[in-house]
Amino acid sequence: MEWTDDGIILGTRRHGEANAIVELLTRSHGRHLGLVRGGAGTRMRPLLQPGNSVGAVWRARLDEHLGYYALEGTRLRAATMLSYSHAAYGITHLAALARLLPERAPHDGIYEQFEAILEDFDDPVIAATHVVRFEMAMLEELGFGLDLSCCAATGTHTDLIYVSPKSGCAVSRSAGEPWRERLLPLPAFLRAGNEESSPDGEADIMEGFRLTGMFLLRNVLEPRGQAHSDARAGFIAAVARSRVTLAAE
């Protein structure tokens, strides 16, 4: 068995004295592990950092075997990313989200979004916007997507400012007013048709994380006996600190 694909390194762990098991998110083969000979050595260390993009050749005698990777760096961005505190937390959080996906199942849309985030990680606001949308995409990919296209109560497509925590559906201002204390705010940049828009300040970003965080925790993480990673909280805090620093300047 053999295939060639593009991949993003999610993590590594030592295997024996000299080798490493490397976990990739690949474009066409999903989340996939393989053994890298010599991967525990210092020569390979710069290549095998989370967030780097690689060209991967995987070989195994049978498809169900762990197999071996031959990797070649195509975009070695990890060293630059890790100079930003939000990026260091962010890549760890993204890797944790990717591990929610079943192994060896293609998720090419998720791969494309993941790579796009890595290219914009130097700007904390842009990175945070991408990460909120990535969490939305993960909910969709795992079968728990939110329906933000129209009001669950009236069917209207305008003035959608709330989300029902029970149904995950949008609610309009007028329909939601009597129950606004029980509803979640829907940031404008997450509304249907606003895919290219930016958050309106830090509050919008934080409301986005609150929204996705609640549904990820309830529908995905808690049923698996998991909680949000510390890296997620670290990323959100680092983004908030960067906003304070920029405002002070």
UniProtKB/Swiss-Prot annotation:
Membrane-spanning intervals of the chain: none
Keyword DNA repair: yes
UniProt xrefs under InterPro entries: ARFGAP/RecO (IPR037278), DNA_rep/recomb_RecO_N (IPR022572), NA-bd_OB-fold (IPR012340), RecO (IPR003717), RecO_C (IPR042242)
Any GO BP: DNA recombination
One Gene Ontology cellular component annotation held by this UniProt entry: bacterial nucleoid
Pfam family name, one: RecO_N
Key words, A-Z: DNA damage, DNA recombination, DNA repair
Keyword DNA damage tagged: yes
Membership in a protein family: Belongs to the RecO family.
HAMAP family: RecO
Function: Involved in DNA repair and RecF pathway recombination.
Record protein name field: DNA repair protein RecO
